[in-house]
């Protein structure tokens, strides 16, 4: 066992003494050491219940002959960080979390890990750190939040972001907005739709890193506690059998995750996190081109918030990820999982599917997959749109550019009534390096939707979007403005042509004009010159490479 390096032999007497000071016994030191990586915080609703899950995990570890050690990582709430400088820290926090998991596990000689994340960057961050170690691990995601209810209608967080736009144009009163505010977020769990946190939980299960039904089992459900306890027991088995993550995370396993993502219409942020996770196995093991290639294999089969009418609880009650495997069984690759069963074995065991929620592939929500990769002179390295949450009339759009050098300027223009039907909003210098931190554009996209402009106005950016964004919002434009990408020289009034079905995005400029503009481009000074974000800005790679640190 790896832990023998800190607990075996006379020379390790001082190490054992320190462990005994924590209450561990000689008998405990004969067992596998299991790190329980918690991300509890009372700031984030997705994480307020994780102490309970950690205790269940530890009970499972003890019951199967292991010795658990709990430690914590940070966890940022994207919703609270949204719309201000705090959002610049969200994506960069993924790398801090990965480094923390790697550092703690290596320093203390753990034989295996149970990861307990919930929200957006914590899930991929923990997995990335654990993969660097290639020791057995299993993931217990914290689970979704139940939707709130007011006057017979269900609400969730995005109702508030869009409600601000509705209030601005007089569609609802301030009193109505306050009533929605008081009920929309019902308690513990990640926001109730298929936003980034829940998308990543679903893909974690699809990768084979969680037990069946873990992703969709809600935070307040006792089944989540049982899954946590079973996961604690299972990790001891994985350590004893020496089943390592790289035995599970094959190319085919990543393809399964992408297929599930495309079929469900997950968050565009998955196109950052899945390549970043895969990068810990091998450089460019998975790229944006894999999303593009696989998007032709599956249709969009689930109408889930923000682009549809269903909530995560509906997906869970419809059969969860095992039911999605079943519906996609002709496409899903048969890969191993931490449960000991293969993906197709899990699919075969499904006893019930609600086909109103998880559609059959021959009767999908949309014929096209839920995510689409576009390329063109604006984005030669690619960009991404959640086409499953776009009004079909906006699949093709041509309009004049309204250019802004920050999210804040764009929000002021939108709420100030300066955006009109037909416009293409361009927000630049918000990429991984330029932002820095690649802020999510939920506030502008929600304002557009709330004001009723989402069927006539497009938004393109080198930043990214919340999993809660809907409408014709195209993000991750690569190369970004800070790297001298063409988005940096688009001017007000330039004609932008978008063809989502044809996978194209271009600005109508001839090559000579493009060359002249790029020659005269002056890249601005970095926005942040001290602290972590300054280092991040210098070291981060492009969005099409997962925005990982070089």
Curated annotation (Swiss-Prot):
One of the record's GO molecular function terms: 2 iron, 2 sulfur cluster binding
Gene3D superfamilies: IlvD/EDD C-terminal domain-like
CC terms in the record's Gene Ontology section: cytosol
Chain positions with N6-carboxylysine modification: 121
GO terms, biological process: isoleucine biosynthetic process; L-valine biosynthetic process
Keywords: 2Fe-2S, Amino-acid biosynthesis, Branched-chain amino acid biosynthesis, Iron, Iron-sulfur, Lyase, Magnesium, Metal-binding
Protein name according to UniProt: Dihydroxy-acid dehydratase
Species annotation: Methanococcus vannielii (strain ATCC 35089 / DSM 1224 / JCM 13029 / OCM 148 / SB)
């Amino acid at each position: 066992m790896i832990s023998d390096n800190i607990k075996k032999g006379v020379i390790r007497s001082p190490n054992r003494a320190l462990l005994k000071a924590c209450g561990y016994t000689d008998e405990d030191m004969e067992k596998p050491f299991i790190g329980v990586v918690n991300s509890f915080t009372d700031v984030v609703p997705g994480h307020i219940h994780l102490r309970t899950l950690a205790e269940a995990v530890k009970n499972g570890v003890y019951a199967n002959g292991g010795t658990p050690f709990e430690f914590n990582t940070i966890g940022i709430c994207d919703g609270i960080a949204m719309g201000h400088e705090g959002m610049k820290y969200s994506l960069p926090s993924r790398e801090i979390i990965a480094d923390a998991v790697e550092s703690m596990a290596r320093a203390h000689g753990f034989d295996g890990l149970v990861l307990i994340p919930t929200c957006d960057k914590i899930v991929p961050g923990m997995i990335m750190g654990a993969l660097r170690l290639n020791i057995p691990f299993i993931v217990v995601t914290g689970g979704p939040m139940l939707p709130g209810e007011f006057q017979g209608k269900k609400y969730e967080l995005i109702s508030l972001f869009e409600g601000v736009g509705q209030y601005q144009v007089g569609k609802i009163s301030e009193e109505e907005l306050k009533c929605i505010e008081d009920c929309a977020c019902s308690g513990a769990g990640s926001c109730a739709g298929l936003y980034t946190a829940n998308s990543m939980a679903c893909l974690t299960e699809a990768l084979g890193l969680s037990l069946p039904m873990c992703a969709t089992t809600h935070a307040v459900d006792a089944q989540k506690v049982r899954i946590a306890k079973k996961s604690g027991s299972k990790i001891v088995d994985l350590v004893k059998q020496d089943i390592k993550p790289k035995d599970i995370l094959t190319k085919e396993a990543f393809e399964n995750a992408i297929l599930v993502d495309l079929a469900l219409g997950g968050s565009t942020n998955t196109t950052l996190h899945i390549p970043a996770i895969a990068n810990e196995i091998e450089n460019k093991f998975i790229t944006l081109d894999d999303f593009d290639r696989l998007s032709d294999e599956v249709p969009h089969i689930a109408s889930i918030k923000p682009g549809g009418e269903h909530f995560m609880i509906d997906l869970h009650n419809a059969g969860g990820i095992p039911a999605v495997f079943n519906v996609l069984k002709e496409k899903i690759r048969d890969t191993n999982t931490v449960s000991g069963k293969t993906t197709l074995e899990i699919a075969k065991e499904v006893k019930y599917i609600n086909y109103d929620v998880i559609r059959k592939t021959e009767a999908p929500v949309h014929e096209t997959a839920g995510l689409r990769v576009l390329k063109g002179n604006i984005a030669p390295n690619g960009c991404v749109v959640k086409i499953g949450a776009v009004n079909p009339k906006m699949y093709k759009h041509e309009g004049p550019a309204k250019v802004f050098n920050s999210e804040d300027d764009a929000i002021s223009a939108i709420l100030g009534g300066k955006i009109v039907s037909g416009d293409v909003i361009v927000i630049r210098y918000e990429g991984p390096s330029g932002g820095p931190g690649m802020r999510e554009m939920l506030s502008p996209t929600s304002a557009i939707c709330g004001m009723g402009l989402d069927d006539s106005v497009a938004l393109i950016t080198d930043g990214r979007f919340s999993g809660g964004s809907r409408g014709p919002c195209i993000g991750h434009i690569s190369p970004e403005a800070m790297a001298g990408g063409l988005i940096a020289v688009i001017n007000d009034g330039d004609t932008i042509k978008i063809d989502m079905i044809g996978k194209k995005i271009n600005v109508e400029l001839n090559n000579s004009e493009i060359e002249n503009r790029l020659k005269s481009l002056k890249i601005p000074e970095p926005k942040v010159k001290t602290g972590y974000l300054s280092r991040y800005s210098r070291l981060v790679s492009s969005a099409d490479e997962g925005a990982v640190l070089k």
